Amino acid sequence: MIGFAPISAPDALAEAAARARQDALTKPRGALGRLEDLSAWVASCQGQCPPRQFQRARVVVFAGDHGITRSGVSAYPPDATAQMVANIDGGGAAINALADVAGATVRVVDLAVDAEALSEQIGAHKVRRGSGDIATEDALTDDQTAAAIAAGQQIADAEVDAGADLLIAGDMGIGNTTPAAVLVAALTNTEPVAVVGFGTGVDDATWSRKTAAVRDALFRSARVLPDPVALLRCCGGADLAAMAGFCAQAAVRRTPLLLDGMAVTAAALVAERLAPGARQWWQAGHRSTEPGHQLALTALALDPVVDLRMRLGEGTGATVALPVLRAAVAALSSMATFAEAGVSTACDDAGATEPPES
């Protein structure tokens, strides 16, 4: 039985206290822009003002292969997934480099890589070798779908129990933006041509094949659209199902989470249907160049923290946003108030001006 505990909202009193404190800090009101909103969100998630700086930010990269790659939808061969899992585990991937400077640690998990698991730990939640070709068959069986969602729940629980105070979901899987595009198209009622991007840098012919594959899978998805679990079974994959479980369970555990790009946010769209209200505990780390990513963000009513034209995945865009989130927390928790610093506030009369920009 697949289920999630009811999602409770972040602490509104802590958020209000954070916004009041922002107005009392030695700066004009609103001068820190989006940082003020982010700091209030962190305070609400932590239930305290000022918020604590993140001590154990954790990136979890969900890996899996997809049968749809046999249709030629990616610029890379399927065996690159297993090779990149080894690269991430060895510390040589982009996510490792970016996490190091952002103050986060990285874990990679194999849900459906089409190879033997690299290690017992990495493969502890492996559901199968490769997901089905969603253009012609279901990605998973019912039991595999349930197992993958449960794996995501268990991984989130394990990370929070180990002390993680911020989670980042990342992905690794050749061709995974194809099932992600199907999920986004299905859940936003969008035509394939408006959702499909160029992924890892495909040419026009590959884009056409990818769009056709999404069209065929989207046709198959119509019969299961009202059921998020059935949608993952039909047109998702073990990695996407696990990411959905992970994102939803982070909210159950009242732990803030940064979403990454197309694959993660597509899974999050499903997660919001599995556990309504979960999106209150998420921020969009970045906006990918994939057109479907913005559609998914709009559906979730999330604004990206950064927009650097990234399209890599792995959790890289969200990890680049982490220092911005840290800066937001630092400003709210470490700045002095006008009263503490003995600085004059803006005058109340009509001709008054606020302190100038420095």
Swiss-Prot record:
GO biological process: cobalamin biosynthetic process
Domain of life: Bacteria
Enzyme Commission identifier(s): 2.4.2.21
Pathway assigned to this chain's UniProt record: Nucleoside biosynthesis; alpha-ribazole biosynthesis; alpha-ribazole from 5,6-dimethylbenzimidazole: step 1/2
Catalytic residue positions: 314 (proton acceptor)
UniProt entry tagged with the keyword tRNA processing: no
Protein keywords: Cobalamin biosynthesis, Glycosyltransferase, Transferase
Alphabetized InterPro entries for the sequence: Nict_dMeBzImd_PRibTrfase (IPR003200), Nict_dMeBzImd_PRibTrfase_bact (IPR017846), Nict_dMeBzImd_PRibTrfase_N (IPR023195), Nict_dMeBzImd_PRibTrfase_sf (IPR036087)
GO molecular function list: nicotinate-nucleotide-dimethylbenzimidazole phosphoribosyltransferase activity
Coiled coil: none
Pfam families referenced in this protein's UniProt entry, alphabetically: DBI_PRT
Family: Belongs to the CobT family.
Function noted in UniProt: Catalyzes the synthesis of alpha-ribazole-5'-phosphate from nicotinate mononucleotide (NAMN) and 5,6-dimethylbenzimidazole (DMB).
Protein name per the record: Nicotinate-nucleotide--dimethylbenzimidazole phosphoribosyltransferase
Native source species: Mycobacterium ulcerans (strain Agy99)
Taxonomic lineage of the native organism: Bacteria, Bacillati, Actinomycetota, Actinomycetes, Mycobacteriales
Name of the encoding gene: cobT
